[in-house]
Amino acid sequence: MADAQFDSALDLLRRLNPRDTKQNLQAITSIVPDLTEDLLSSVDQPLEIRRCPKTKRDYLLCDYNRDGDSYRSPWSNEFDPPLDDGTVPSERVRRLEVAANEAFDVYRELYYEGGVGSVYFWDLDDGFAGVILLKKGVSPGGKHSGEWDSIHVFEATDRGRMAHYKLTSTVILHLSNENEALGEMDLSGNMTRQIEVDMNVDSDASHVANVGKLVEDMELKMRNLLQEVYFGKAKDVVGELRSIGPLSETNRDRATHQEMIRGLQR
């Protein structure tokens, strides 16, 4: 029964506006509380921002830095609200996490020119795993607004001088535009892609460079795919549905065009 409810919940969420994922999750878990943990760990939702009380720096919230109702800051490695027995990475993995946060902070400034980014690592039996989060918003709540959320989850398995990486990347995008002439348009969606690759590892620092290259390449591919395929198709659909000119003028032009075709066929 629980598996059927879980599958039904996922199917329902796939059919609803990704912009409202958080509210829809709350509604579903209020009806079936037993699904809360499974849904929170399985469903990607727009990232939320919180400020680290110790360092005064913003960081992003997700299921991977959550322990109960507390969230761990990547800058201080402390939980907010405070949690005495919260799960933190080992000393080695924490050093990698700090280095990755510094590297992706530069990446965020270069590629996003602002926004917020956070990186979280945790230990595995034969390596480690992590998540890279990036968020950029434009005029949230205004007539012209947009939000981009990138969630990159990876596993790194050590194999001597090589490491096997498995990366799952998700982009959640929301664009909204409203004006008096054309009305309102809301475009929301998400995309997920995966890749597995073996790469050379000379030292722990190589892991940060390798993951950075994988994320950079994946984001470039997903941006191009969104722009060329999804945005291009959406533009064609909107162009078919909407016309800047009056409907009467469009109908008159269409009638004239059809009359010319009939004249040529005689």
Curated annotation (Swiss-Prot):
Cleaved signal peptide residues: none
BP terms from Gene Ontology: actin cortical patch organization; barbed-end actin filament capping; cell morphogenesis; filamentous growth; mating projection actin fusion focus assembly; mitotic actomyosin contractile ring assembly; mitotic actomyosin contractile ring contraction
SUPFAM superfamilies: Subunits of heterodimeric actin filament capping protein Capz
Domain of life of the organism encoding this protein: Eukaryota
Keyword Cytoplasm: yes
CC annotations in GO: actin body; actin cortical patch; cellular bud neck contractile ring; cellular bud tip; F-actin capping protein complex; incipient cellular bud site; mating projection tip; medial cortex
PROSITE patterns on file: F_ACTIN_CAPPING_BETA
Molecular function GO terms recorded: actin filament binding
Alphabetical UniProt keywords: Actin capping, Actin-binding, Cytoplasm, Cytoskeleton
Xref: InterPro entries: CapZ_alpha/beta, CapZ_alpha/beta_2, CAPZB, CAPZB_N, F-actin_capping_bsu_CS
Subcellular location: Cytoplasm, Cytoskeleton, Actin patch; Cytoplasm, Cytoskeleton
Keyword Chaperone part of the UniProt annotation: no
Family of the protein in this entry: Belongs to the F-actin-capping protein beta subunit family.
Subunit structure, as described in the record: Component of the F-actin capping complex, composed of a heterodimer of an alpha and a beta subunit.
Function: F-actin-capping proteins bind in a Ca(2+)-independent manner to the fast growing ends of actin filaments (barbed end) thereby blocking the exchange of subunits at these ends. Unlike other capping proteins (such as gelsolin and severin), these proteins do not sever actin filaments.
Protein known as: F-actin-capping protein subunit beta
